Each structure stands twice: as structure tokens, then as C-alpha cells.
Amino acid sequence: MNDFWQHCSALLERELTPQQYVTWIKPLAPVAFDAAANTLSIAAPNRFKLDWVKSQFSGRISDLARDFWNAPIEVQFVLDPKAGQRSPAGATPLAPRAPLPSANPAPVAPGPASAPAVDAHAPAPAGMNAATAAAVAAAQAAQAAQANAAALNADEAADLDLPSLTAHEAAAGRRTWRPGAANANSEAADSMYERSKLNPVLTFDNFVTGKANQLARAAAIQVADNPGISYNPLFLYGGVGLGKTHLIHAIGNQLLLDKPGARIRYIHAEQYVSDVVKAYQRKAFDDFKRYYHSLDLLLIDDIQFFSGKSRTQEEFFYAFEALVANKAQVIITSDTYPKEISGIDDRLISRFDSGLTVAIEPPELEMRVAILMRKAQSEGVSLSEDVAFFVAKHLRSNVRELEGALRKILAYSKFHGREITIELTKEALKDLLTVQNRQISVENIQKTVADFYNIKVADMYSKKRPANIARPRQIAMYLAKELTQKSLPEIGELFGGRDHTTVLHAVRKIADERGKDAQLNHELHVLEQTLKG
């Protein structure tokens, strides 16, 4: 077991950046290997590390274990606060521990040491009169009550997931950590990420840029360089899996590098709603407000989840006003243009519009290829451009779908012991490609666009040229080129036998105007989301 872990650690150290290795892999320790059940238990020192390693590195560790023992190995992660102190070279295999459940219960803050139980009716010690004994008992009872109250407050604070301001300030005063720093500062790094909830892997360096997201990336970099000054708030919107969350984590990580003492918090809108409810139940709104109003950077993801939640919106409005007044930066993401989010108070919508709103579009072909090539490289796999282009051409919706497809291809190749070719890719993605081809057709595009612009489907094939017909027809041609595998001549034939040059002109015209016309861009975004279901 220890030989394997030394081998595994050495490989991961070569594959990962120094920051990733020191932060996530080095604190782990193997604690048990059950040869009969083919299970390996690995301990992590805290819940945050355990959850992250489990989600990001368990697959790679399982692969290395299978290669090492020449058998499928189930890797289980367990919690052990002393994991980072273990020495793999001298570790003694322990009995296998039960794996932790997948749910993430709220962390329990360590309370003060339990006060000794007080028996008010116990006889007084020798030499102590009854009055003195009663006074001592009363003092002990008060001390116990105070300890219990402190423990209760600590539990509630942990459940609310609000790091204390004193913890923030203390860490800010002593923190000198940078990515790749020595082990002495790894504890400070852990503390930073646990408080901020930032994902240190999501940076500007590994964000693939193309026409679809270059404006959003430029705005994000500007905000990271000048928080609270350039664009406040910065509002990013777009479909699922297009990189909104990656970008806002990148901003937070960049600010931590530039200003290690900055008070930063990433939170999903659902968690914010949950915290508001808990604060209301516990009458802890003073703590809630003090925490959120004191931040330097608030990153709130998927704000559409605030829809219909008036108390949450009210609290967020006050937090927003306080942060902006203090020149703190607010960054928000949504799946929809701000004014299109239903169930949100008008005064919040007006605040969203007061900064910069930027759309992130589905990646274009070249960008999808670049994403696949980079992801394959990070997995230590050589992927030919032919295969990358094939996958990128057939899967168009978002980055997560591309990465999921690549994982299927890699697993299929490894399982069958075959080289990754276009033929193998077709086999691996057979079901996915069938669904994609069935979902979107030119006929469906024509009907959807006609309904959207209130014209007849027959107008798509006609020779009529009024602007209210010609424009939707050009948009339908553009979407047919973007969302189907049809060639230009095939698309032209389906639009009333038009020449392929007519289709090409329409595609180029709409693509060019999309980058300049915010209203057109929004309409296309709505149509694309509708067609993709």
C-alpha cells in the first residue's frame, strides 16, 4: 500500500502544478488496503479537502491503483484530521474504514471543552461551609451554561457557514501564501480556500478563450485588476456549462494572488437562500449582515434562483448597496439576461444593469477543438486534431458536454485497449451522437424561428424579400449552419432551392451582426436555448 502511494504521489506531482500538488495531494495518506475486497482507503485531513479530492482526483487515483495492482480497485476517501501528519513510508495498514456518505453535512465548529458536570446536591468538601459550597456550585453552573451557550453559537455559525470576521482578519495579518509556496504556508492556503469557497484550479491560465467568450474574459481580467472600480457589478449570463463559474473563480483567485488579505466569498444562489432562512430561524441577521457587508469581493452564481424569494432579495439588496458603497466588487452570474429573469424585484434588476452585462455564448468550432485538445493534454493523452474536430463538429452546446464526451472516449479506448481514432470515437459516442442528430433538424429550426418572429413557415421557402421575412430567414439559415451537420448546398435546398452562396452570405451577415447588436445576440441566444431544449 505504501509503495503504491509513493508511486502514485510521484506521478501526480509530475502531472499537477506545484500549487495543486501541495494543496490537494500532499496532505492525503493511505490508511488501509483490503486485498480481498480490492478497496483502498485514503484519508484527507478535513471535509473540504475530502470533497474536492473525491470529485477531482478519485478517477485518476483509481486508474493508477488499477495499473499498480493489475485489478480494478475501489478507492474510498475517509476523514482523518491527522492525515497530513502520517508518513506513508512508515504507515501501518489499518482496518478498512467505512466511506463517508456523499452528502455534505454542514461542518461542526469545534466548541470549547465541556465544562464539568455540576451536582448542586453533592456534599460540600471537608473544610468548606455550606454558603461557600453553594457559591462555588453557582459559579461552576454559570461557567457550564456559558460554555454550552458558546458551543451552541459555534454550531449555529458553522451551520450558517459564515467564517468569522476575526478569523478573516487574523489570517489576513499573517498570510504570505502564494501558489507553489512551501509547506509552511499550506495551512494558510487551506484556510483561505475554505473561507472563500474558491476553487484554486479555475484560473485565467486554463480558461480557453474564443470569440464566444473573449469579451467576458477581458471584462473579468479588468475587474480582477481593478476591483470595485472598473465594472461594478459585473453580470455574466449564458447557458449551462459555458464557463461562467470558471471565470468568476478565476477573478477571485487572481485577487487572492494580488491581495492576499482580501475578504472574498464565492457562493451559489441556492446556498445564499439557505443561509438567509437559517439566519431568520436563529435570529442571527446581525451576524449575517456583518459578514456579507464586510466583504471585498462577493461572487454569486446562478442568481436566477432568487426568483420569487422576496426576503432573500431584500437581504441581498442591502448587501449589494453596502458593498458598492464601500467600493467592494460584486460579480453575478445567471442563465438569462437580467431583464428576462422572472420573479426578481425591479430595484435589483436596475442595480444589475448599473454595471456591465456580458453574454457568454456557446463555443465556436475552433474553440471547441482547443478545449478538447487542452483537456486531453491535461489527462496525459495525445488526441489527434481529426478526432478533436469530429467531436467538436457534432457536439456544440457547451464545455461540460465536450469534457464528458472526451471522458467517454478515453474510458472506451482504455477498456478496449485500442488507439483513439474517429471510428473508435463514433463507437464510444454512438448514443450521444444519435441523440444530437435527432434533436435538431433544419425543419425544426425553420418552425421555431417562424414562431419566434411571427411569420409563416412557408415564408422560409418563399422568394419574398420584405425585411420582416428576409431577416428571420437569414437567422434560420445561420442557425441551420451552426446547429446541424448540413452543408451549405443542403441548407440552401431546404430553404426553397437557394444557392449555397446565398446561405453563406446570410451566415456571415448574421455572425458579424451578432457581435455588434446586443438585441440580435439576445434573440439568437433565446432561439438556441429553445432548440437545444
From Swiss-Prot:
Lineage of the species this protein comes from: Bacteria, Pseudomonadati, Pseudomonadota, Betaproteobacteria, Burkholderiales
One family name in Pfam for this protein: Bac_DnaA
Protein name: Chromosomal replication initiator protein DnaA
Subunit structure: Oligomerizes as a right-handed, spiral filament on DNA at oriC.
Subcellular location: Cytoplasm
Recorded superkingdom: Bacteria
PANTHER family, sorted: CHROMOSOMAL REPLICATION INITIATOR PROTEIN DNAA
Domain description: Domain I is involved in oligomerization and binding regulators, domain II is flexibile and of varying length in different bacteria, domain III forms the AAA+ region, while domain IV binds dsDNA.
Domain II: annotated span: 72-196
Coiled coil segments of this chain: none
Alphabetical list of Gene3D superfamilies matching this protein: 1.10.1750.10, 1.10.8.60, 3.30.300.180, P-loop containing nucleotide triphosphate hydrolases
Region Domain I, interacts with DnaA modulators, annotated ranges: 1-72
MF terms in GO: ATP binding; ATP hydrolysis activity; DNA replication origin binding; lipid binding
Function: Plays an essential role in the initiation and regulation of chromosomal replication. ATP-DnaA binds to the origin of replication (oriC) to initiate formation of the DNA replication initiation complex once per cell cycle. Binds the DnaA box (a 9 base pair repeat at the origin) and separates the double-stranded (ds)DNA. Forms a right-handed helical filament on oriC DNA; dsDNA binds to the exterior of the filament while single-stranded (ss)DNA is stabiized in the filament's interior.
Keyword annotations of the record: ATP-binding, Cytoplasm, DNA replication, DNA-binding, Lipid-binding, Nucleotide-binding
NCBIfam families linked: DnaA (TIGR00362)
Region: Domain III, AAA+ region, residue numbers: 197-413
Comp. bias (Pro residues): 96-110
Family indicated by similarity: Belongs to the DnaA family.
Organism the protein comes from: Burkholderia pseudomallei (strain K96243)
GO cellular component: cytoplasm; plasma membrane
Binding positions (ATP): 241, 243-245
Biased composition (Low complexity): 111-120
Residues covered by region (Domain IV, binds dsDNA): 414-533
Region (Disordered): 83-120
GO BP term (any one): DNA replication initiation
